[in-house]
Swiss-Prot record:
Higher taxonomy: Bacteria, Pseudomonadati, Pseudomonadota, Gammaproteobacteria, Pasteurellales
Gene Ontology molecular function: mRNA 5'-diphosphatase activity
Name of the protein this chain belongs to: RNA pyrophosphohydrolase
Natural source organism: Haemophilus influenzae (strain ATCC 51907 / DSM 11121 / KW20 / Rd)
Coiled-coil ranges (or none): none
Residue span, Nudix hydrolase domain: 6-149
Gene: rppH
Motif (Nudix box): 38-59
HAMAP family attached to this UniProt entry: Nudix_RppH
Class of enzymatic activity (EC top level): hydrolase
């Protein structure tokens, strides 16, 4: 489903843990990382699409998370010309997204990126709250900056314990994350970093 302006309606999902870190997912077969996201079907609300994508991409059920906040507005980004499919009608020029902030309330062992025959991701890790804004692919960066700013005002204001833990985590994980982003990792590293 593509709107009259050429944007595909989409949901984005930010999952945080009790330390204020967020789940950062690695796209299959690529050294590219992002938050889970996916299209909204014709017969779905944005919230229904979010829970479907949550299960398909991350393996979590509604009982595994708590919905903290939904972005007030649709946020848009345009695709680079090299990613446009000029032969498709109607042509999609980008995504318009409604973003959801979730807190993981179950064990992280329930996270499973392999629930479908064609998974989107083949690895994940917890990163400090602002890390994704610096690391996401450039054409999504403005949307990530806006959504994380909006979510920060909710998450850190309403959850002082998370706020204090996150400040510490941000200072501890910045150098490690910077080093990590410059290194090519295999699946073995993901499991090792998670203590498995």
């Amino acid at each position: 489903m593509i709107d009259f302006d050429g944007y595909r309606p989409n949901v984005g999902i930010v999952i945080c843990n009790r330390k204020g870190q967020v789940l950062w997912a690695k796209r299959c077969g690529q050294n590219s990382w992002q938050f889970p996201q996916g299209g909204i079907n014709d017969n779905e609300s944005a919230e229904q699409a979010m829970y479907r994508e949550l299960h398909e991409e991350v393996g979590l059920q509604p009982k595994d998370v708590r919905l903290l906040y939904v972005s007030k507005h649709w946020l848009r980004y345009k695709l680079p010309k090299r990613l446009l499919r000029y032969d498709s009608k109607p042509m999609c020029i980008g995504q318009k997204q409604r973003w959801f902030l979730l807190q993981l309330v179950s064990d992280e062992k329930n996270i499973n990126m392999q629930t479908t025959k064609s998974p989107e991701f083949d690895g994940w890790r917890w990163v400090s709250f602002w890390y994704p804004v610096r690391q996401v692919v450039s054409f999504k960066r403005d949307v990530y900056r806006k959504v994380m700013k909006e979510f920060a005002s909710i998450l850190f204001t309403d959850n002082p314990l998370i706020f204090s833990a996150s400040r510490e985590a941000n200072s501890l994980h910045y150098s490690a994350n910077k080093k990590y982003s410059q290194t090519k990792y295999t699946k073995r590293h993901f499991y090792k970093s998670r203590g498995q």
